[in-house]
Swiss-Prot record:
One of its GO terms (cellular component) is endoplasmic reticulum. Present with 238 molecules/cell in log phase SD medium. It comes from Saccharomyces cerevisiae (strain ATCC 204508 / S288c) (Baker's yeast). The chain crosses the membrane at residues 56-76, 81-101, 124-144, 150-170. Its main location: membrane. It is a multi-pass membrane protein. InterPro entries: UCP010056. This is Uncharacterized membrane protein YGR016W. It comes from the Eukaryota. Keywords: Membrane, Transmembrane, Transmembrane helix.
Amino acid sequence: MSRLRRFNRKILSLSSDYTHDGESDQEDVSILPLDTEEQEELIQKFETNAHITNKLYINLLSILYLLYGGLLMILVRKSRGYIKLALLAGANSLICSCITLRYDIVNDYLLFKKFKLRVSNFSINIINIILLVLMAWISFNHVVEDKKTVLCLQVPMFLFWVAVLVKRWARNIEDEIADLRCLKYKYKNA
């Protein structure tokens, strides 16, 4: 019986030696094999943490899009001619970027009971790219003398690429977590 107790103490001391000190809000993660329930709990923690951080980033970026879109709409009221058209295209581009960032859209609409219109993130991105090209064309051909306005009109293009990258990053994290679920091994702790 004493041998068994010594063996248990050695095992328990080994497991405490091989724990990794994580953040203060997370439990210690052992590098010893995890049983299936512990694996599922760990994957659930990863999934929850990824979901929370994705929501935080998406909400912060959405606020940024709305604030900058509001600024562009204020500038639209004060401007004329080609600048007004470019600013309107930039504001609409920000709206499209915000929609594709926040939502996964696939809808079919019937127009006049004959035509079927499919609206998806891909089609919204195509419209967004057309708006960005229009805005860039106007800004480089007609607003060349005012560098501040040209720079102001390039921000929606930058925010479009930020939305694309954040969406891709979130999708990659989801794929990695799905791959992690496939890598679970069967281990029962006696």
